[in-house]
Structures are given as structure tokens and as C-alpha cells.
């Protein structure tokens, strides 16, 4: 007798071994048709995903997985990657298959082929995938020995797959999945038949080196997306279109904010308007430092290699560091700011009464990121962090973490981000410090989030090598997630670098060090801001807050006068005194996302007024200049958007 416990606690008895599919059928025909797999927990074991054909030999807990579950969607995407490889082999028999994992919102598969795949090839492959899916071929799991699998794949000319399998220990039993004439190595699980794969689309082809090594052959990576329903896929494709429209690289070029060029890969050339935006962000964060007990500091860009060895960075991070030599000494260009802040702390002797001691820096860092991973401002080699380090006692740790989370939430709201996700990243395999230290650090982070009422997930093994951290992830206007701020506990670096304070018993002790950043990379955060607002920055951030346009030459002097008046009040204002038609001026400045356009002619000049247009078609009519200045000042003080109604100004 086999007893199966379902998620609602109900139990079903079977006379002998039973498959996941049979359990689903016993519950109902609808569930049996929808079943893609199962989540099984057997006595003494961890939950794991299995195929519908998996046989339950003993009592177990079972949840039927369908397309409505996240695991079910992953199974659909994984199986669609296999369907892609199946279709490619049908159309291009000489192509060799390599790997095909699930990624965010889809999948990819890498192929070796004698010529590049064309857009026409992609269309043909997608059509073939649809044909194979409609055949509803059964997907079956088979177990092979390693040597048999190597021999098989070599015999059919699949050298890459044979190489992968040959690297697996000889005594390990392998699982292969078969659908029609196609067989592939895979742990699984997979959907029960190709007919379950109804909604998918191939997106693009890109290059990828075999095993990620630039010394190896360049393969062709076909990306695709797959979904449970057509509505879900349509929503995703619409989001991609919107993301393309909001691409910070395009907007940065169109609005004359910044540019990139080949002579400086991963680095940014800031134009005047872009740098004005940068300054607003930096000045805001400087006020955050000042208002929350941080002392701003500045540490050197390069430090002797001996210091990076002491911190552990050289052993754990050397491949990402730039180095330089001078007078027979080797220096590392800093990838992080923390060692410099410890040196500042160490420059004097500190009492426990001074703690917590908070340092903040707009620290410029450089990391030797692979050229293929660079992406506009989102992935760069040179960047500036709003980097802070808090030196405190163990007793102060939770308070500091909780206070930081509350501060971070306010900052994000001010910048227009209202949804934050929280993750605690725990100890990685490659780390420094004892398990006892890691236990203390992880507990402190989790308790601080509980105290601030934040629900959080745990990301096992995702912490930095020197300590666990909280990762703060933002959700933007089109639903994308951006990992942004962090706070990280570090018991190790202060000890390694000899940081000490004198406690109440007049004993020297190492402080706890918190690494914290709210924005993270300012470059990346500004890229996020640009995309979140589609380039239309709220007045407090806009590089140019208003443009004064004269209708004709007689009103040009009045336009210039207004511009100077507003500038003297601290506003970022420009004038447009060209002899162009006013409609053209309005259109041009609207395309430049200027929050306010002030139009003045003879009537406005006589009455000392301005006709005000707000971005997005907002018509504020003709008002006194003083009233406009007051409105703009309120916009800046409240950090509100230009189209926000007056009734919700407070």
C-alpha cells in the first residue's frame, strides 16, 4: 500500500507503486490533462521536481505541477529548449547541439553550425517547432551509463555533447530524454509530451563561446521565450517593445545626455545635460548622508597590492581588478571602497562612545568586466557608488540595519520607485571567516528585516565572500526588477586590517563593519531612472526644468529677462530666442522632455505673465511669473511629477 499526501493534507491510498500521472488522474480528469510534473517529498528527503511518469514506490507528499506554477513554467521553457534543438536537427542535420538552459522569461540553446543562422532560418525553425509540438510526441526519460552515452553521441557526430558527458564521473547514471528521433542529455524533468508546448517564439541569434572561453569556437545561441498562455506571451512581448522604447542608450543619445565610444569600453562620456542630471542625484544623496549621521570622506583610487592581499580581494577578486606598476611596486585600481574606509577609521583611536561611526563616499571604482558583458550604463567598467561603511558594535548591528532599510525605502520613493523586494544572500562556498561569524551575521540581517516588517526571501550561497547581505530589488514602471541597494555585514575585514575601538572595559575590540549602498552604481541607477521615467524626469531631477520661448522678436527681451529671473532663484532654465515658429519650438522642447515650456508674446510682456505648458500636454494657462516659480518650487520640494494634479500636491 502506498499513501500519497496532497498539499491540502488529504491522503490517497494506492495498492502499489503509482505514477504522478496516475495520482493526478485519481484526483480528476482536468488535473490529469493539465499535469506537467510533480513536486515530491519522500521520507527523509528534500522536495524535488519529477516527471509525470515518475513512480512513487513508498509513502510520499506530492503536489501536481501545472502551467499555473512557476515550476511548471520553467518545465515548459526547458522542454521548449529541447523542442528547439529537435527542430534544428530536423532542418539542419549537420548542426551540433551543446547546451540549452532556462533563463529569465525564456530559454536558449547553443549550436555549432557551418554558417550563421539567418532571420529566415529562425522563422523556419519556429515553424518546424510548431509542427513537432502538434504531433504531440511523448517525451520519455531513459537512464544510460556514461560510456554508452559518450559512444552514442560520438556515433551520431555530436562531439560537443560527447565532451560534456565524458566530463561526468564514470559511475554516475545519466538521464536522457527522447522525443521522436531526438535524444538529449538532461536531468529533467520535462513535460509529458510535445503537445504541452503551445506558446513560444524565437527571439534572436547571438554569439557565445563554447564553455564561455574566448579561446574556444564561437557558437550560435538562439534565444526564445515560452509561456503558459498567449495572453502572457503577448504581455511579455509588449513589455519588450516598451523596454526598447525606454532604452537608456537611445534616450541618452536623443536627449544629448551622454555617449559611449570604442576608445573607452565600459566608460561614459557625460554631456552637460547628463552631468546636470548626475549632479542632482549626487546632491540629493549628499543630503541623505548629512541628514543621517554620515561623514563624507574620500579615499585614494589606487592602493598597493599588499593591502588588497590583506583584505582577501586579491585571492577572491583578482580577475576583476585592473593593476598598474610604478617604481617596482604593483598597485590595484580599487574595485571597492571598503579598504580605504578602514584605513581612515584606523587613522585614529576610537572609543565605543563614538560608535556607530558612519562614513560615506561617492567612490569611483573600476572592475575589469568582460567586454561581452558590457551594456550601456547598466554594466560598466568604471562607476561611482554612494558607498557607505558603518563601524558599530554587535549590539548596535540590528538597529543600524533596520534604520538603513527605512532610509532606503524613503530614498527609493523620492526617486519614483514604490515597490521593493528583499532578499537575504547567505554564505557562498568560497568565503572568508568562520561559520560562527557567518551565523551571527545572517541572523542579524534577517532579524532587522523582520523588525521593519519586510517580507524577504533567502538566496542560499549568494553572499559576497566576506559576508552575507540584504539585496534590495526595485520594480520599475514596466514591471522589470532591478537589484539595486545592499547592506552587508562584515566581521572579517576589520580584523584583517587591524581596525579596533576601545570598549567600556577599556579593552580593544574589532568593530562590526556594515557595507551599505542605496543606489549602488550611480551610473546604473541613472540608467534605471531614465528608463523608469522614459526620459521624462520630474522637475527636481530634470537637467533643464523650463524653457522660455518667445513668440516673436519683440518679446525676446522679456523671455531673456524671465530666464534670468528664474535662474537667480536657483532654477535650471534656458531661453529659446530663435526666429522659428512657436509651434516648432514647443515640439522640439517637448521631444527633449523639458518639464515646462513658458511661451511669451506681446500680451504676456505687457501683463508680466507667462503661458505655461507642462510635459504630457498639461495646459496651465496664463499665470503670473511668481505663481509659476512657486509651482516649480513646490514640484522640487515635493519631488513630484509635472503632471500631478494640484489636489495631490501634498
Swiss-Prot record:
InterPro entries: aa-tRNA-synt_IIb (IPR002314), aa-tRNA-synth_II (IPR006195), aa-tRNA-synth_II/BPL/LPL (IPR045864), Anticodon-bd (IPR004154), Anticodon-bd_dom_sf (IPR036621), Beta-grasp_dom_sf (IPR012675), TGS (IPR004095), TGS-like (IPR012676). Belongs to the class-II aminoacyl-tRNA synthetase family. Keywords: Aminoacyl-tRNA synthetase, ATP-binding, Cytoplasm, Ligase, Metal-binding, Nucleotide-binding, Protein biosynthesis, RNA-binding, tRNA-binding, Zinc. Homodimer. Residues 1-66 form the TGS domain. GO terms for biological process: threonyl-tRNA aminoacylation. Zn(2+) binds at residues 338, 389, 515. One of its GO terms (cellular component) is cytoplasm. It is an enzyme of class 6 (ligase). Its EC number is 6.1.1.3. Its cofactor is Zn(2+). This is Threonine--tRNA ligase. Its main location: cytoplasm. It comes from Bordetella petrii (strain ATCC BAA-461 / DSM 12804 / CCUG 43448). Residues 247-538 are annotated as: Catalytic. Binds 1 zinc ion per subunit. It catalyses: tRNA(Thr) + L-threonine + ATP = L-threonyl-tRNA(Thr) + AMP + diphosphate + H(+). One of its GO terms (molecular function) is tRNA binding. Pfam families: HGTP_anticodon, TGS, tRNA-synt_2b, tRNA_SAD. It is found in: Cytoplasm. Catalyzes the attachment of threonine to tRNA(Thr) in a two-step reaction: L-threonine is first activated by ATP to form Thr-AMP and then transferred to the acceptor end of tRNA(Thr). Also edits incorrectly charged L-seryl-tRNA(Thr). SMART domains: tRNA_SAD (SM00863).
Amino acid at each position: 500500500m502506498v499513501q500519497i499526501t496532497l498539499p491540502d493534507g488529504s491522503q490517497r491510498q494506492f495498492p502499489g507503486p503509482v505514477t504522478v500521472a496516475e495520482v493526478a488522474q485519481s484526483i480528476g480528469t482536468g488535473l490529469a490533462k493539465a499535469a506537467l510534473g510533480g513536486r515530491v517529498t519522500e521520507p527523509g528527503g528534500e522536495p524535488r521536481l519529477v516527471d509525470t511518469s515518475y513512480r512513487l514506490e513508498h509513502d510520499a507528499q506530492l503536489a501536481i505541477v501545472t502551467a499555473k506554477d512557476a515550476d511548471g513554467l520553467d518545465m515548459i521553457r526547458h522542454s521548449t529548449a529541447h523542442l528547439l534543438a529537435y527542430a534544428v536537427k530536423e532542418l539542419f542535420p549537420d548542426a551540433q547541439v551543446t547546451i540549452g538552459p532556462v533563463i529569465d522569461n525564456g530559454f536558449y540553446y547553443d549550436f555549432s553550425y557551418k554558417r550563421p543562422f539567418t532571420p529566415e532560418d529562425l522563422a523556419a525553425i519556429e515553424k518546424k517547432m510548431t509542427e513537432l509540438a502538434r504531433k504531440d510526441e511523448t517525451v520519455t526519460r531513459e537512464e544510460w551509463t556514461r560510456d554508452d552515452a559518450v559512444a552514442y553521441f560520438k556515433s551520431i557526430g555530436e562531439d560537443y555533447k560527447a565532451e560534456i558527458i565524458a566530463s561526468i564521473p564514470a559511475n554516475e547514471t545519466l538521464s536522457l530524454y527522447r522525443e521522436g528521433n531526438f535524444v538529449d542529455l538532461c536531468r529533467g524533468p520535462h513535460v509529458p509530451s510535445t503537445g504541452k508546448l503551445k506558446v513560444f517564439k524565437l527571439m534572436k541569434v547571438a554569439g557565445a563561446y563554447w564553455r564561455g572561453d574566448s579561446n574556444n569556437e564561437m557558437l550560435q545561441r538562439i534565444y526564445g521565450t515560452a509561456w503558459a498562455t498567449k495572453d502572457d506571451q503577448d504581455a511579455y512581448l509588449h513589455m519588450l517593445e516598451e523596454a526598447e522604447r525606454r532604452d537608456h542608450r537611445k534616450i541618452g543619445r536623443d536627449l544629448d545626455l551622454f555617449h559611449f565610444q570604442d576608445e573607452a569600453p565600459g566608460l561614459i562620456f557625460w554631456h552637460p545635460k547628463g552631468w546636470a542630471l548626475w549632479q542632482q542625484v549626487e546632491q540629493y544623496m549628499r543630503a541623505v548622508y548629512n541628514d543621517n549621521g554620515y561623514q563624507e570622506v574620500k579615499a585614494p583610487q589606487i592602493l598597493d597590492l599588499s593591502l588588497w592581499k590583506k583584505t582577501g580581494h586579491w585571492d577572491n577578486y583578482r580577475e576583476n581588478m585592473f593593476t598598474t606598476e610604478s617604481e617596482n611596486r604593483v598597485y590595484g585600481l580599487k574595485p571597492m571602497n571598503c579598504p580605504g574606509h578602514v584605513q581612515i577609521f584606523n587613522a585614529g583611536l576610537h572609543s565605543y562612545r563614538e560608535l556607530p561611526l558612519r562614513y560615506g563616499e561617492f567612490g569611483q571604482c573600476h572592475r575589469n568586466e568582460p567586454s561581452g558583458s558590457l551594456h550601456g550604463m547598466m554594466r560598466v567598467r568604471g562607476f561611482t557608488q554612494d558607498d557607505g561603511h558603518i563601524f558599530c558594535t554587535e549590539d548596535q548591528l540590528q538597529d543600524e540595519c533596520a534604520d538603513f532599510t527605512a532610509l532606503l525605502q524613503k530614498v527609493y520613493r523620492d526617486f519614483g520607485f514604490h515597490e521593493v523586494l528583499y532578499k537575504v544572500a547567505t554564505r557562498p562556498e568560497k568565503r572568508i571567516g568562520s561559520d560562527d561569524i557567518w551565523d551571527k551575521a545572517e541572523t542579524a540581517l534577517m532579524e532587522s528585516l523582520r523588525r521593519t516588517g519586510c517580507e524577504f526571501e533567502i538566496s542560499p550561497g549568494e553572499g559576497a565572500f566576506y559576508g552575507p547581505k540584504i539585496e534590495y530589488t526595485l520594480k520599475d514602471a514596466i514591471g522589470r526588477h532591478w537589484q539595486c541597494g545592499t547592506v552587508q555585514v562584515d566581521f572579517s575585514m576589520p580584523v584583517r586590517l587591524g581596525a579596533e575601538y576601545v570598549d567600556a572595559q577599556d579593552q580593544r575590540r574589532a568593530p562590526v563593519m556594515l557595507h551599505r549602498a542605496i543606489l549602488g552604481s550611480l551610473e546604473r541607477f541613472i540608467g534605471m531612472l531614465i528608463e523608469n521615467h522614459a526620459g521624462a524626469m520630474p522637475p527636481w531631477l530634470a537637467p533643464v526644468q523650463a524653457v522660455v520661448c518667445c513668440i516673436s522678436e519683440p518679446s525676446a527681451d522679456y523671455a531673456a529677462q524671465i530666464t534670468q529671473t528664474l535662474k537667480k532663484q536657483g532654477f535650471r532654465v534656458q531661453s529659446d530666442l530663435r526666429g522659428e515658429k512657436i509651434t516648432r519650438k514647443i515640439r522640439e522642447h517637448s521631444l527633449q522632455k523639458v518639464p515646462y515650456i513658458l511661451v511669451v508674446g506681446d500680451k504676456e510682456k505687457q501683463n508680466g505673465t507667462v503661458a505655461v505648458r507642462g510635459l504630457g500636454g498639461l495646459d496651465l494657462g496664463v499665470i503670473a511669473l511668481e505663481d509659476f516659480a512657486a509651482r516649480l518650487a513646490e514640484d522640487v520640494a515635493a519631488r513630484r511629477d509635472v503632471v500631478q494634479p494640484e489636489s495631490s500636491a501634498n
